[in-house]
């Protein structure tokens, strides 16, 4: 974690290992009147962080490299998700599209593309056969490796069940891991109406991908049927799934990319997500006076959750709000999340100011190292999910654990203390 004294307070981040020297005053902020009455941005006028050492001149500071993040859409579904992210204005990320279908690649908005398996498929696609998709990726393995050079974090997105996405995504992940990238898979499981064959292929693809990524988030498309209106057109339903993919990527990348008074290091995120296995993703939106409670509750309890995040050992959560976002609201949201995760969880936290969210708050929670129990956390309140896209919706998406983990036990991230200023009501100091 690094201090940035020259940048505006549009992103605040804390890690479970505690804060930098000079932050002891944050505990007192929660009991002071400024918390309830002042927006979070105003607190920048109250210095609570240590200045750089006077013995080190500014021109002697070695600039750090910004973490390089890429999103790679594999197959038709993955490329559609990439198009959605680009259209939504996600910044600070390089987008790539990978497909066997040359015609589909001509319609992508991604600035960089790889047509895999040109000799094998002649640009005509995989015909819904994952074996063809896998062989195509193997044929173009060197090209995939070149596209990942110098990359720190890779998101691999695909629609499971088809040919290219199902077969090629695990190979892309394998190459990324070999090159030392933190590799996160965010994929969809098909709707039931897409047929048993596609569902079976999807499960096989998910199992193959699970063993090749650090963290895997699976979006069960079929559960969208329980929260979207019955009259929702088919195209809109798929768009909703694509937008959930986008929010998952952005919830993690914003913490790393957007500069602020205190920046969360890429190493902090890696500590939670490296070799974490399956993950649950929750996204909640709240508005009005109780927006913090509403957003946090929606993020951890939704009709889309297949299992509970109870006892999660690793958590990345991002709070986004307008310039009226207060420190008190951040604390309220954090306490709700801390109620359901492990007391010694390694927690990475970030707060982002977005002028478009005046009067609203959006929370993204990524939980890893959980027990995967089917019982959902009992929320004190709930909000009706609206899946029309941010910032007016609530979307919560889990991934599932495979029946038999090919890698055996999932190694947990190192356990770190929860920040004192957020956990003093919940957990005593050690």
From Swiss-Prot:
Keywords: Cell cycle, Cell division, Cytoplasm, GTP-binding, Nucleotide-binding, Septation. One of its GO terms (cellular component) is cytoplasm. The keyword Cytoplasm applies. It comes from the Bacteria. One of its GO terms (biological process) is protein polymerization. Pfam families: FtsZ_C (PF12327), Tubulin (PF00091). GTP binds at residues 76-80, 163-165, 194, 198, 242. Residues 374-418 are annotated as: Disordered. Homodimer. Polymerizes to form a dynamic ring structure in a strictly GTP-dependent manner. Interacts directly with several other division proteins. Essential cell division protein that forms a contractile ring structure (Z ring) at the future cell division site. The regulation of the ring assembly controls the timing and the location of cell division. One of the functions of the FtsZ ring is to recruit other cell division proteins to the septum to produce a new cell wall between the dividing cells. Binds GTP and shows GTPase activity. Belongs to the FtsZ family. This is Cell division protein FtsZ.
């Amino acid at each position: 974690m690094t201090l940035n004294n020259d940048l505006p307070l549009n992103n605040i981040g804390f890690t479970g290992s505690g804060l930098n020297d000079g932050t002891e005053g944050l505990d007192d902020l929660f009991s002071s009147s400024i918390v309830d009455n002042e927006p979070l941005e105003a607190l920048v006028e109250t210095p609570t962080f240590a200045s750089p050492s006077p013995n080190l001149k500014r021109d002697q500071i070695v600039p750090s490299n910004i973490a390089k993040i890429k999103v790679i859409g594999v197959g038709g579904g993955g490329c559609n998700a990439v198009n959605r992210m680009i259209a939504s204005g996600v910044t600070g990320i390089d987008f790539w599209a990978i497909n066997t279908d040359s015609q589909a690649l001509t319609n992508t908005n991604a600035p960089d593309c790889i047509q895999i398996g040109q000799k094998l498929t002649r640009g005509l696609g995989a015909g819904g056969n994952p074996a063809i998709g896998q062989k195509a990726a193997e044929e173009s393995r060197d090209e995939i490796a070149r596209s990942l050079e110098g990359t720190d974090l890779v998101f691999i997105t695909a629609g499971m069940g088809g040919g290219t996405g199902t077969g090629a995504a695990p190979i892309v992940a394998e190459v990324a891991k070999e090159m030392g990238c933190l590799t996160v898979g965010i994929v969809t499981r098909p709707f039931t109406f897409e047929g048993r064959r596609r569902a079976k292929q999807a499960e096989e693809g998910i199992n193959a991908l699970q063993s090749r990524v650090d963290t895997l988030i699976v979006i069960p498309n079929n559960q969208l049927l329980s929260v979207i209106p019955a009259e929702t057109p088919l195209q809109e339903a798929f768009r909703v799934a694509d937008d959930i993919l986008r929010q998952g990527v952005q919830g993690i990348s914003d913490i790393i990319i957007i500069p602020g008074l205190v920046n969360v290091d890429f190493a902090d995120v890696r500590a939670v997500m490296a070799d974490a296995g399956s993950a649950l993703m929750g996204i909640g939106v709240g508005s009005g006076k109780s927006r913090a409670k509403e957003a946090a509750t929606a993020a951890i309890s939704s009709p889309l959750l297949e299992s509970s995040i109870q006892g999660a050992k690793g958590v990345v959560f991002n709070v986004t709000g307008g310039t009226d976002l207060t420190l008190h609201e951040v604390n309220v949201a954090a306490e709700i999340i801390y109620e359901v995760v492990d007391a010694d969880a390694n927690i990475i936290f970030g707060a982002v100011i977005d002028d478009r969210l005046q009067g609203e708050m959006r929370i993204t929670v990524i939980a890893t190292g959980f027990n995967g129990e089917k019982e959902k956390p009992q929320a004190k309140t709930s909000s009706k999910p609206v899946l029309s896209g941010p910032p007016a919706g609530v979307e919560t998406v889990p991934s599932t654990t495979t029946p038999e983990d090919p890698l055996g036990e999932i190694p947990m991230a190192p356990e770190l203390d929860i920040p004192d200023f957020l956990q003093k009501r919940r957990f005593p100091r050690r």
